[in-house]
Every structure is written in structure tokens, then in C-alpha cells.
Amino acid sequence: MKSVKKLLLLAFAVCLAVGFSGCLEQPKIEVVGQKIQKVDADNTKIEIQVLVDNPNPIGISIDKISFDIYALVGGDKIYLGHGEQSNIKITSGNTTFTLPVTISNKKLVEVALKEKSTKIPIEIKGDIAVNLFITKVNIPIDIQQEIDVSAIAKEEVLNQLNNLNPNQIQSIAQ
């Protein structure tokens, strides 16, 4: 999870750095939490909590953050998932918002098996639509990084174990 967290933090930091480049100080961005919302046979849905500390007297409106996540395996790009959020208002001071991300479990397992590792090189491509009051600007996102997906698997196994009732535990033990 920390790698995914760092990756999303990096993507958002690039966005805000460009958006606030004319201001006195660059806002500080921090991922303050993440939670696996839902895991099913097909997808894992994660919510990333982002805190922006904007020391500037003015805020900014992000109309939309939208990005796709690809695994980079043997020269190929394999689609893993998508993240998107709209209407984010960054005010002066502290602002917190959530970035929902959906990842394909089938593709994630496929890539991990091909790589023979839980550490997967990925690329995030997308756009950030920023409303600068006078005009709107689309800022491209193109980030390459390695993530460790073992945390997703570990958290889901623990969740499943915690949800077992005594009868299920007894039948497993036999």
C-alpha cells in the first residue's frame, strides 16, 4: 500500500506544483490514509486520503483528476486500473479529499506472475483539469514508478481471516 500511496502522492504533487507555480509557496501534499474499500473476484477498490496544506492566500479548483494505471512488462503496457475524482476545491490552509482507485485483480495477478515478483513497474497516464478562474488548463500526468502489490494481497487475506466465523474456522482446521 505504501508504494501505491507514494505513487498517488507523486502524481498529485506534480499537479499542484504546476498549478501553483505562480504563487508564493508550493503547497505541501501528504497521503494521510488509504483504505481498501472492496475486494471482489474482479477488482480492488482503494480510497486514498490526500491532505493539501496550502500556505497561499488563494485556492485553486481542480475540475477533474483522471488517470489510468499500466504495468510495464517486457516492453508491453498492460492496463491495471483507473482513478478519477471531480470538483476538488483546494482552499488556503488545509484541504483533505479522497481519490478512489480501481485495480483489476486478474491483471494484477497476471503481471505479478509474469514478473515473478510483487514489485511491478507501472506507468500512470492521465490529465488534471485545473480551473484557474480566467482559463482552464489540462495538465498531463505521465509517471513511471515501481510499486509493491504485496500489501494489497496481505490486507485482503487478513480481512478474509477476520471475517471467518467459528464454524468456518473449525471446518478449515479439520
Swiss-Prot record:
Q: Gene3D superfamilies, per this entry?
A: 2.60.40.1820
Q: Does the keyword Membrane apply?
A: yes
UniProt entry keywords in alphabetical sequence: Membrane, Transmembrane, Transmembrane helix
Q: Does the keyword GTP-binding apply?
A: no
Q: Name one GO biological process term.
A: response to desiccation
Q: Which Pfam family is one of those matched by this entry?
A: LEA_2
**Annotated InterPro entries:** LEA_2, WHy-dom
| Species assigned in the record | Methanocaldococcus jannaschii (strain ATCC 43067 / DSM 2661 / JAL-1 / JCM 10045 / NBRC 100440) (Methanococcus jannaschii)
Look up the domain of life of the source: Archaea
Q: Where in the cell is it found?
A: Membrane
**What protein name does the entry list?**
Uncharacterized protein MJ1138
Annotated membrane topology? Single-pass membrane protein
| A single cellular component GO annotation | membrane
Please list every transmembrane segment annotated in the UniProt record, as residue ranges: 7-24
